[in-house]
């Protein structure tokens, strides 16, 4: 049976086109995906991301568990509220999931994991936690909203009780704090997102969600569907689990080597494989592509390089660049002339560094 968020009726009343996304009925757009994309880049949009899974970890051994569980190092997390992006790996070095972990107290950390991997993640985390003094708690009582765009932070802050505004305005990137709404209900606000824009992601009680959603709409924040969320994240150079990486792909093969910390004395799951890959290199890599000719890059299209064949992972039309962009996994080595097979035509594409767009600005290498 398909799942629905607390905002399902609200989305339908706003005219949203609803689709099945990882077993959840979610809005893909509210009329024009391209207009929604531009509104986030230029102003502020609100996303219902309540399909995401929130997992709280309690106990005296949470940090030792996470030092084992995650490829990035939670030893970086020393200030309450600070967050870290990491991959969770299997023993073969493949990515079980990518996630954000928050340090709240020494005996209390929080995960935000993907909707599509919920059952797998919970099973894996519980299995690993069984050797530690840790209690794993899924927070199905919480909903999640993302407010993103250059005006997003101001719009959210204006809705908070005055006693909390200053602290939220000063909140640094990849940091969170809990404040009270006007109705005195707890809001967990983090300065994170999946769009390449500034903004907040907000966890709140299910019963408070419609009230906050409507209050933000009244300020001029527009509802944004998952279609624009995908084009925004791709422009921002952000991976999508299940499309850009999975359990057969290591972080080094998914342009996520920057999330791996091979710090001394920490034997995280998959480390042996990653150490070998770092020493010897990997046989394949993820690159960014931009197509100057008309057309769209699509998942699965064949990519031809001097080193051999690869394929498009994520591809889309970029509303900001007015060109097709994509990620591709291709053989290792410096790709020179690269072509994509589109309807039996080999179309030349350029290899460019990503992100393609960051905070509304086209990156300098795009139009070289």
Curated annotation (Swiss-Prot):
Top EC group: transferase
Keyword Zinc annotated: no
Pfam families named among the record's database cross-references: GCV_T, GCV_T_C
Record keywords, A-Z: Aminotransferase, Transferase
Transmembrane segments annotated in the record for this chain: none
Annotated catalysed reactions: N(6)-[(R)-S(8)-aminomethyldihydrolipoyl]-L-lysyl-[protein] + (6S)-5,6,7,8-tetrahydrofolate = N(6)-[(R)-dihydrolipoyl]-L-lysyl-[protein] + (6R)-5,10-methylene-5,6,7,8-tetrahydrofolate + NH4(+)
InterPro entries: GCS_T (IPR006223), GCS_T_bac (IPR022903), GCST_C (IPR013977), GCV_T_N (IPR006222), GcvT/YgfZ/DmdA (IPR028896), GcvT/YgfZ_C (IPR029043), TrmE/GcvT_dom1 (IPR027266)
GO biological process: glycine decarboxylation via glycine cleavage system
Known EC number: 2.1.2.10
GO annotations of cellular component type: cytosol; glycine cleavage complex
Gene Ontology MF terms: aminomethyltransferase activity; transaminase activity
Description of how the protein assembles with itself and partners: The glycine cleavage system is composed of four proteins: P, T, L and H.
Function: The glycine cleavage system catalyzes the degradation of glycine.
Family, per entry: Belongs to the GcvT family.
Entries under NCBIfam families matching the protein: gcvT (TIGR00528), PRK00389.1 (NF001567)
HAMAP family reported in the protein's UniProt record: GcvT
PANTHER family: AMINOMETHYLTRANSFERASE, AMINOMETHYLTRANSFERASE, MITOCHONDRIAL
Protein name listed in UniProt: Aminomethyltransferase
Annotated organism of origin: Xylella fastidiosa (strain Temecula1 / ATCC 700964)
């Amino acid at each position: 049976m398909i799942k629905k968020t607390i905002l399902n009726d609200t989305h339908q009343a706003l005219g949203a086109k609803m689709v099945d996304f990882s077993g959840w009925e979610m809005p893909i757009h509210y009329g024009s995906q391209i207009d929604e994309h531009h509104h986030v880049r230029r102003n502020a949009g609100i996303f219902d991301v309540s399909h995401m899974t929130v997992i709280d970890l309690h106990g005296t051994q949470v940090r030792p568990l996470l030092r084992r569980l995650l490829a990035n190092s939670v030893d970086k997390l020393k200030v309450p509220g600070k967050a870290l992006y990491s991959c969770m790996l299997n023993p073969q070095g493949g990515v079980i999931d990518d996630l954000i972990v928050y340090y709240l107290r020494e005996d209390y950390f929080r995960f935000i994991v993907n909707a599509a991997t919920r059952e797998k993640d919970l099973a894996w985390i519980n299995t690993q936690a069984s050797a530690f003094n840790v209690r794993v708690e899924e927070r199905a009582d919480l909903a999640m909203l993302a407010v993103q765009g250059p005006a997003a932070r101001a719009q959210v802050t204006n809705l908070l009780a005055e006693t909390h505004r200053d602290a939220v305005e000063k909140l640094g990137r990849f940091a969170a704090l809990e404040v009270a709404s006007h109705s005195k209900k707890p809001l967990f606000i983090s300065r994170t997102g999946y769009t390449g824009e500034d903004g907040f992601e907000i966890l709140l009680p299910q019963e408070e969600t419609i009230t906050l959603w409507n209050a933000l709409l009244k300020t001029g924040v527009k509802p944004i569907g998952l279609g624009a969320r995908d084009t925004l994240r791709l422009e921002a150079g952000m991976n999508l689990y299940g499309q850009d990486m999975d359990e057969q792909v290591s972080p080094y093969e998914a342009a996520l080597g920057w999330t791996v910390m091979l710090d001394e004395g920490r034997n995280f799951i998959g480390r042996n494989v990653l150490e070998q890959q770092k020493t010897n290199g990997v046989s394949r890599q993820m690159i960014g592509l931009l197509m100057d000719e008309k057309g769209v890059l699509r998942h699965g299209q064949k990519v031809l390089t001097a080193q051999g064949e690869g394929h498009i992972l994520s591809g889309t039309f970029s509303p900001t660049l007015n060109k097709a962009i994509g990620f591709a996994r291709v053989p290792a080595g410096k790709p020179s002339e690269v072509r994509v097979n589109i309807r039996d035509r080999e179309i030349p594409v350029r290899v460019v560094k990503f992100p393609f767009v960051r905070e509304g600005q086209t990156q300098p290498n795009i139009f070289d």
